[in-house]
A protein has these predicted regions:
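Glycine-rich flexible loops
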Residues: 2-180
Length: 180
């Protein structure tokens, strides 16, 4: 919230449940990141998955699809953030959205970000699979004209990457604006 890495309430956060390779917690729909409490995280399991997909007022079905598929197909993605932050979203809209290593923050992400150019705006099941495949062994996925997904082994690592990719995108776009 204070770092402006959100867009209203259209953001998702998830973390794998301890000792489970399939269950994960995801934030409720309609709650601003600055207002989310532990009690606002919903445990998604194999048993309640389909039921939760039919409760869009409780949980965004695209969040279940995107996060569930990535957690299942990308073992290193224990924590996932999906946001529409200002600079990462602007970067995702460029013809060439690849961050060049021009400073210490952009170097963190050199060759560590995949770009998903097929993003159609809704992460339903087929698209979620394509997104997970595009992420592959990298930790970050730029969604063309949309935003960013960052992953981490822990919540702290995922948030750290989210913070620094936004700073890297800001630095890179500022440098591009100089036309030098």
């Amino acid at each position: 919230y204070k770092r402006q890495m959100h867009e209203g309430v259209a953001n998702h956060f998830s973390a794998c449940a301890p000792n489970s390779s399939t269950d994960f917690y995801v934030n409720k729909a309609g709650i601003h990141f600055s207002q989310i409490k532990a009690s606002d995280l919903i445990l998604v399991t194999k048993k309640n998955l389909e039921d939760l997909k039919n409760k869009p007022d409780l949980i965004d079905p695209t969040a279940i699809n995107i996060h569930g598929t990535i957690h299942k197909k990308v073992p290193h993605a224990k924590c996932i953030f999906h946001v529409h932050s200002k600079y990462a979203t602007a970067l995702s809209a460029l013809k060439d959205p690849i961050l060049k290593p021009i400073d210490q923050n952009t170097m963190i992400f050199y060759n560590r970000v995949s770009v998903f150019n097929e993003f159609g705006g809704l992460g339903f099941e087929d698209e979620s699979i394509k997104m997970a495949n595009a992420l592959g062994n990298k930790q970050h996925l730029l969604l063309a004209n949309h935003g960013i997904i960052t992953t981490g082994e822990t919540i702290a690592e995922g948030f750290n990457y989210l913070y620094y990719i936004e700073k890297a995108a800001e630095t890179y776009l500022t440098a591009l604006s100089s036309n030098k």
